[in-house]
Amino acid sequence: MARMNRPAPVEVSYKHMRFLITHNPTNATLSTFIEDLKKYGATTVVRVCEVTYDKTPLEKDGITVVDWPFDDGAPPPGKVVEDWLSLVKAKFCEAPGSCVAVHCVAGLGRAPVLVALALIESGMKYEDAIQFIRQKRRGAINSKQLTYLEKYRPKQRLRFKDPHTHKTRCCVM
């Protein structure tokens, strides 16, 4: 059987946050996908495309799969952004340095946009976030998504006040 030429998963690390951006597996390629997740230590997978595989084998391996699909080529809806940032904050405050995998169909649009939002919310400028991701994932983020990220106004949701010093710091530092 001919194997589709898909980009390899890429790790994006920033301030004790680790993301694995990848394409979607199929039931036929699921074992390789699970091996990749284990190699990077990812215990959570965010699936932002339509279902293309059975998540039961991942769950049996202790990997949580979260489904937040949205339209290909489009920016994420507000609810997906809120849920994503809540998950990122909880995951990296609880276990700094852990890894969250996120995938769409090709790993070039929806998944990189969510990672860019996390970088922006933790203090990175949007231009730097895009460049940072594109250095690892060539062709990531289309023009409509670029415009969305340019207009996006962070609320510093991945930062918190230290009750002892009253200074704001990133929750994942």
Curated annotation (Swiss-Prot):
GO molecular function terms listed in the Swiss-Prot or TrEMBL record: protein tyrosine phosphatase activity
GO biological process, one term: regulation of vascular endothelial growth factor signaling pathway
Outcome of mutating D71A: No effect on enzymatic activity
Subcellular location: Cell membrane; Early endosome
Gene3D superfamilies per the UniProt record, alphabetical: Protein tyrosine phosphatase superfamily
Post-translational modification: Farnesylated. Farnesylation is required for membrane targeting.
Result for mutant: C49A: No effect on enzymatic activity
Regulation: Inhibited by sodium orthovanadate and peroxovanadium compounds, and by pentamidine.
Effect of substituting C104S: Reduces migration-promoting activity
Tissue: Mainly expressed in cardiomyocytes and skeletal muscle; also found in pancreas. Consistently overexpressed in colon cancer metastasis.
EC top class, as a word: hydrolase
Role played: Protein tyrosine phosphatase which stimulates progression from G1 into S phase during mitosis. Enhances cell proliferation, cell motility and invasive activity, and promotes cancer metastasis. May be involved in the progression of cardiac hypertrophy by inhibiting intracellular calcium mobilization in response to angiotensin II.
Cited InterPro entries: Prot-tyrosine_phosphatase-like, PTP, Tyr_Pase_cat, Tyr_Pase_dom, TYR_PHOSPHATASE_DUAL_dom
Keywords: Cell membrane, Disulfide bond, Endosome, Hydrolase, Lipoprotein, Membrane, Methylation, Prenylation, Protein phosphatase
Effect of C104 to A/S: 95% loss of enzymatic activity
Residues that coordinate or bind substrate: R110
Organism: Homo sapiens (Human)
Subunit-level organization: Interacts with tubulin.
Official protein name in the record: Protein tyrosine phosphatase type IVA 3
Reactions that this protein is recorded to catalyse: O-phospho-L-tyrosyl-[protein] + H2O = L-tyrosyl-[protein] + phosphate
